[in-house]
Amino acid sequence: MSRRRAHDTEDEGYDHRRNKRRRVSENQEIEDRLESLILRVGERSTSSVESNLEGLVSVLEADLGTFRLKILRILSDCAVRMPEKCTVYTTLVGLLNAKNYKFGGEFVDHMVKTFKESLKMCRWDAARYSLRFLADLVNCHVISATSLLQLLDTMIDVSNEDTVPQVRRDWFVFAVLSTLPWVGRDLYEKKESALESLLLRIEVYLNKRSKKHHNALRVWSSDAPHPQEEYLDCLWAQIRKLRQDNWAEKHIPRPYLVFDSILCEALQHNLPTIVPPPHHDNFEYPMPWVVYRMFDYTDCPDGPNLPGAHSIERFLIEEHLHHIIETYHHERKDCAAQLLSFPYKHKIPLEYCIVEVVFAELFHMPTPRYLDICYGSILIELCKLQPATLPQVLAQATEILFMRIDSMNTSCFDRFVNWFSYHLSNFKFTWSWDEWDSWLLLDGEHPRPKFIQEVLQKCLRLSYHQRITEMMPTTYAKLIPLTPVPNYKYANEEAASLPGTTVAHQLVVAIRQKCTPEEVVNILKDIPNSGYSGEEMSDGSFNALKIDVFVQTLLNLGSKSFSHSFAAISKFHSVFRALAETEEAQICILHNIFELWSSHQQMMVVLIDKLLKLQIVDCSAVATWIFSKEMTGEFTKLYLWEILHLTIKKMNKHVIKLNSELSEAKDKLAKADSSSSDSEDDSSHKRKKPITHADKPSEEVVERMEEKLEAANVNQKRLFLIVFQRFIMILSEHLLRSDTDGRDPDTDWYRWTIGRLQQVFLMHHEQVQKYSSTLETLLFTSDLDTHILEVFQQFVALRA
């Protein structure tokens, strides 16, 4: 072969590769353009939704031959990820089906596959949106009404399953009910008797289901002025109202009505038989909730009316607003802008709807979806974007919450405190405090003065003491926090009579001269174990006076800031560990922190958090200290429960971390063994990558990890047993004493305490659930007072 010929061949090869790359690039550009067109269809533009759809159908129809799979994937993704545009995309699919029946069938198959996969993978929202999309395709003459009703009936069959959690049955009923607003009218016109039969089956189920969980999830214990309805009961009432109105709703846009003459000529597809996957123990279903209500039409000024609590429009509006928050919560400015750009804002009092939905998220039980500060920051952005109206609505909401606070759930009380203090800090702490003057005459444990006091404590964390003092009217003097300074007893006037004063002064000099931990130990060694303690807690197993002198002196020297305190603790970590060998000694350390910093709640919180991180004190010691007699006067203060919850969370995170590490190690071991076995069987022509020793944990390592996890589980169980046992003891004692004295046990103290018990159950429900049978056997037995036992039974019912 000549050189010339070889050269030509090389050029041809190069041109071929270049043309192939160009085709790939061009295809990618077309795919990107198609995706952009599909994603943006129906959004604000100079032309109507209908003309947008017509233009897009023409484009997609031309590209179906080449980009069929891509178009199928994009449309099915939009159905799940953009439920607010459901009817736009169903109309698009309907028009494509009218032009290309085969593509319509392929899309239905694709959506069915998405729906089944979502159910199998426990992606419950995705499954619900897929079902809604399939249902709306009935309106577009893509799917037959008969086959949809068969699917809905199959889903309602789950409500008759035995030995499965009620939350599973509830979800399938909820999924069907929440789909009916889209397709109810069409089913009513075409298959009225079948629809009525379906509704009757739902009603039978709803009438017999247990609602033991209801009270645990309420924001308020009182139903005045707005009932706190369980979510399925509320939706069922809304669906019944919709049925009374002949399934005519006024909220859902239905662009397919314009194309009815085209769509009604299209051939329909039948859904295949879809059987919901059976229940497995590892399936987690959405927990029940209570529908939050703050406003009704009387709260809103002149303008559009707020839809009634049982109108389906209220459900649809709230669901849409919740979805906006879910989509944009990572970026507060975008979230606020999207909420205020709600497409139907001229038909409703939008500011009231938004504020109600944001507080519904914040007060959601057992825990909010996102951090408290997420909702606070969104509300701030809303006030900035809509300064003429939204601050007034928010002030009105705050007043409503404050006036109803005496029946508010304890967890929601905490969140209200956190939100309001944060909000004030962003608006120069401006509030009409004079309007709340009259509530200062109430007992200090009453929720209203308690709320004001806790808000001021939180404001102190976000500002400084002098600012808080200056901003408050003089009538609030008794609620203003104490000046946050350490109370170092070895520098007080009475210090000369205290047994540890001399050593404390020596220690001050030594630490200021940058002594070593060993030198501190040397100074402390001469302190006698006299059994001295501020609470006589020493039984001789530890030297309480030595702990007293060391802890108070060191932390007083580090009192300038959190950083100074942390540095001091870290430097003398070994001394702390040596002194804190027993749980009693650890409680003594906590006692001294409280004695030194009783006027600075935040300092106590961060110091105890630091001691837990450094493993100087155990979680069980903190729990025991919180319930000790010394802390009786602090028992209803919010910071103490902040400490308990951070303690429990620390233990929970430790257990979760060990569990994750063990699972990962077991997976690696199993894969290594499997790979080794496959390599032996594999033919020599295909050599597999060898598993290195570093990749494969030994069985001994896995066994040690199992032992560590078992020990952590034991400690976690012990922590919960301590907490719940102490709650039972103090509540039982209160109830017995009230009965003996003939007094009403339902005091403010009792409501705070029973609320805190409920809070522990709900805030840590995932971890507590593991030990529910143990708790039932050892603590929450049938002979326990019904008031206490009911809290436990409500908790168990959440996932029953």
From Swiss-Prot:
Disulfide bonds: none annotated. Its main location: nucleus. Residues 1-26, 669-700 are annotated as: Disordered. GO terms for cellular component: nuclear cap binding complex; nucleus; postsynaptic cytosol; presynaptic cytosol. GO terms for molecular function: mRNA binding; RNA cap binding. Keywords: mRNA capping, mRNA processing, mRNA splicing, Nucleus, Phosphoprotein, RNA-mediated gene silencing. It is found in: Nucleus. Residues 31-243 form the MIF4G domain. The modification Phosphothreonine is found at T9. SMART domains: MIF4G (SM00543). GO terms for biological process: 7-methylguanosine mRNA capping; mRNA export from nucleus; negative regulation of viral genome replication; nuclear-transcribed mRNA catabolic process, nonsense-mediated decay; primary miRNA processing; regulatory ncRNA-mediated post-transcriptional gene silencing; RNA splicing; siRNA processing. Component of the cap-binding complex (CBC), which binds cotranscriptionally to the 5'-cap of pre-mRNAs and is involved in various processes such as pre-mRNA splicing and RNA-mediated gene silencing (RNAi). The CBC complex is involved in miRNA-mediated RNA interference via its interaction with Ars2 and is required for primary microRNAs (miRNAs) processing. Also involved in innate immunity via the short interfering RNAs (siRNAs) processing machinery by restricting the viral RNA production. Belongs to the NCBP1 family. Component of the nuclear cap-binding complex (CBC), a heterodimer composed of Cbp80 and Cbp20 that interacts with m7GpppG-capped RNA. This is Nuclear cap-binding protein subunit 1. It comes from Drosophila sechellia (Fruit fly).
